């Protein structure tokens, strides 16, 4: 299908969000999906999304026109709210209204999009082109990757541009921070490149210093554009958007991630917490 948005990281390879939601069968084949209901698709143009690993916090890019910037794109958040149990005894949920992130992240004359939440939901990476952005070799404002951190009160810090070697004179966009909290995948026009946007990976150490980015190489990168790479929580499978020979516009592709490009191994416990007080002690064994 001609989907022109980056995929959202499917934590358990069961759900992927594009412009629509698509669910995988046991054979990992996706159906045609369904449009998301309120607060999505309510008149604004919606772009990239990112979902926390507990599926409770979602960040989405959406149009937010202003008199001085009718093309303004900003970042919003929404939370998944427990709505009690339904007649079948199952918990039901709904997405709350969209909340515009503040001036620490959004800028009135800039472009903030392509969010990437950390697994803990305490770091937000995103791409932005701003009034003070430098120009690339073609005279276009450069997109850079920024990060904001949530404090103990739940407030987001002033977003800072990632330092070199992540930032460069080229275009950087479409970040994805793996649940290991260390491995960052992103798209860039930097050299060496096969052409257009290529996919890159960098890792940060205990001192919060990023390693020199590594190009994912052929056959993932081509002379066309590749971006929006996301990696499953187990680190085995990657999904990305590509405009290349044989595709119809910008399509979503997947591939098994080679060992050299994998993030650190993480263990994710998936379940539903029942707020009903237990009648006895609960023992959890890993």
Predicted regions located by residue number:
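Short, conserved micro-motifs composed of acidic
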Residues: 1-272, 277-283
């Amino acid at each position: 299908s001609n989907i022109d948005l980056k995929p959202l990281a499917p934590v358990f390879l069961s759900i992927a969000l594009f412009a629509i939601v698509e669910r995988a069968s046991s054979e990992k084949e996706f159906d045609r999906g369904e449009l998301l209901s309120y607060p999505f698709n309510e008149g604004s143009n919606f772009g990239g999304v990112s979902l926390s690993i507990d599926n409770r916090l979602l960040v989405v890019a959406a149009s937010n026109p202003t008199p001085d910037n009718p093309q303004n794109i900003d970042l919003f958040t929404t939370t998944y709210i427990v709505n009690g149990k339904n007649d079948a005894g199952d918990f039901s949920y709904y997405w709350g209204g969209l909340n515009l992130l503040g001036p620490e992240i959004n800028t009135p004359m800039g472009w903030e999009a392509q969010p990437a939440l950390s697994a803990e939901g305490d770091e937000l990476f995103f791409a932005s082109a701003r009034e003070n952005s430098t120009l690339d070799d073609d005279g276009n404002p450069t997109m850079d990757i920024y990060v904001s951190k949530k404090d103990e009160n739940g407030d987001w810090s002033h977003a800072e541009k990632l330092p070199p070697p992540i930032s460069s004179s080229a275009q950087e966009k479409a970040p994805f921070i793996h649940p290991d909290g260390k491995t960052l995948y992103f798209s860039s026009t930097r050299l060496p490149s096969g052409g257009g946007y290529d996919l890159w990976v960098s890792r940060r150490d205990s001192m919060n210093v990023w390693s020199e980015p590594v190009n994912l190489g052929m056959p993932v990168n081509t002379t066309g554009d590749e971006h929006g790479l996301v990696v499953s929580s187990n680190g085995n499978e990657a999904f990305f958007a590509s405009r290349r020979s044989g595709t119809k516009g910008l399509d979503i592709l997947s591939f098994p991630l080679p060992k050299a490009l994998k993030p650190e191994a993480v263990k994710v416990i998936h379940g539903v917490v029942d707020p009903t007080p237990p009648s006895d002690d609960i023992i959890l064994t890993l």
